[in-house]
């Protein structure tokens, strides 16, 4: 997965300076969401550990602790409360070569890009995930089994990366997964800073289902603009989302207070092909537009604000959201210099 590749590469590359010291990273945040007039609150923390073992092995895991406070329904006053704590994934990586990493354990399914690249609370520009985030992620978003990933080809003009995985069925409360398999292939063009990829998953238990996806990421050089998009299709629904954000390069860029503002826009639509539901996509055709304005403080602190208008045959709703996120990163102990 993308995070694994980055952390593994960083840990191995910095071995001389840090003697393979485990890193603890993650984020802590506090979020509010007002949906159709009802406001809920959700403080949470997502710690992540990456622990190199020698030159070729890496253990990594991310967990979540979340408290949710929400209005009591049925005209009852006051708030209800829910708590969850558990691992999101826990895996071991064997870096066989620069072209191949072998992953075993509980891993995040690499279908399209949101699940394994953008779902961390310190990375996403908007509090809510896309409406099609459930397509191809087999309910839990993770698998228990093995995965092969790496760079199949790389040059100054283009690079090709791949993931291929198989997951067994697991009914464990913390490591729940479906029997399934799939893969993803992406091509990146460094000169144009463009990435295009395709994904395919197949559920292999109960009713077998196929999922198809494609993604396009583009970051035009020297503009401060980013565009990310996905299309996903399952047996019962399909949809897409397109998200853009912008950080000005004027006024000293991120060193100036104006350069820390980050406007965000996401447009998305979902379409149901039948009334069967096994994918987490809304039960009726839905359109949603999100308008966000984030502020990036120094020292890894972000404020997220957004307004969304959602249209569907069921009803139209307004969604107001705010949040503050702190990203942390530190070694577990001081390494010895060679």
Q: Residue locations for each model-derived region?
A:
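Cleavable N-terminal export/targeting peptides
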Residues: 1-19, 332-338
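Outer membrane beta-barrel
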Residues: 20-26, 37-169, 177-179, 186-193, ...
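Detector for outer-membrane/organellar transmembrane beta-barrel domains
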Residues: 27, 55-56, 186-278, 326
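Structural signature of outer-membrane beta-barrel domains
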Residues: 31-33, 66-68, 109-112, 167-171, ...
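Transmembrane beta-barrel architecture of outer-membrane proteins
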Residues: 43, 86-88, 168, 179-181, ...
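Solvent-exposed loop segments that connect transmembrane elements
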Residues: 71-80, 272-282, 327-338
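Outer-membrane beta-barrel "beta-signal"
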Residues: 148, 244, 317-338
């Amino acid at each position: 997965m993308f995070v694994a590749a980055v952390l593994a590469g960083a840990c191995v590359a910095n071995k001389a300076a840090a003697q393979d010291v485990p890193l603890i990273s993650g984020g802590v945040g506090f979020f509010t969401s007002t949906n159709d007039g009802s406001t809920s609150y959700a403080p949470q923390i997502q710690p992540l550990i990456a622990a190199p073992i020698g030159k070729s092995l890496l253990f990594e895991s991310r967990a979540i602790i979340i408290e949710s406070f929400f209005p009591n329904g049925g005209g009852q006053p006051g708030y209800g409360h829910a708590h969850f704590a558990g691992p999101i994934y826990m895996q071991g990586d064997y870096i066989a070569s620069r072209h191949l990493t072998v992953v075993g354990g509980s891993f995040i399914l690499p279908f399209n890009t949101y699940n394994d690249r953008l779902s961390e609370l310190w990375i996403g520009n908007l509090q809510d995930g896309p409406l099609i985030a459930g397509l191809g992620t087999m309910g839990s978003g993770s698998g228990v089994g093995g995965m092969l990933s790496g760079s199949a080809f790389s040059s100054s003009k283009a690079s090709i990366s791949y993931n291929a995985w198989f997951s067994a069925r697991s009914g464990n409360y913390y490591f729940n997964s479906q029997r399934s398999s799939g893969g993803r292939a992406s091509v990146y063009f460094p000169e144009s800073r463009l990435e295009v990829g395709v994904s395919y998953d197949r559920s292999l238990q109960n009713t077998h289902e196929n999922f198809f996806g494609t993604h396009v990421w583009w970051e035009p050089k020297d503009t401060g603009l980013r565009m990310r998009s996905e299309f996903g299709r399952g047996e019962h629904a399909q949809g897409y989302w397109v998200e853009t954000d912008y950080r000005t390069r004027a006024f000293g860029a991120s060193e100036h207070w104006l350069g820390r503002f980050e406007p965000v826009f996401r447009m998305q639509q979902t379409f149901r092909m039948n009334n069967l539901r096994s994918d987490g996509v809304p039960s009726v055709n839905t359109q949603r537009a999100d308008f966000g304005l984030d502020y990036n403080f120094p020292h890894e602190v972000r404020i997220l604000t957004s307004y969304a208008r959602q249209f569907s045959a069921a009803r139209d709703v307004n969604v107001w959201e705010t949040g503050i996120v702190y990203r942390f990163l530190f070694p577990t102990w001081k390494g010895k210099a060679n």
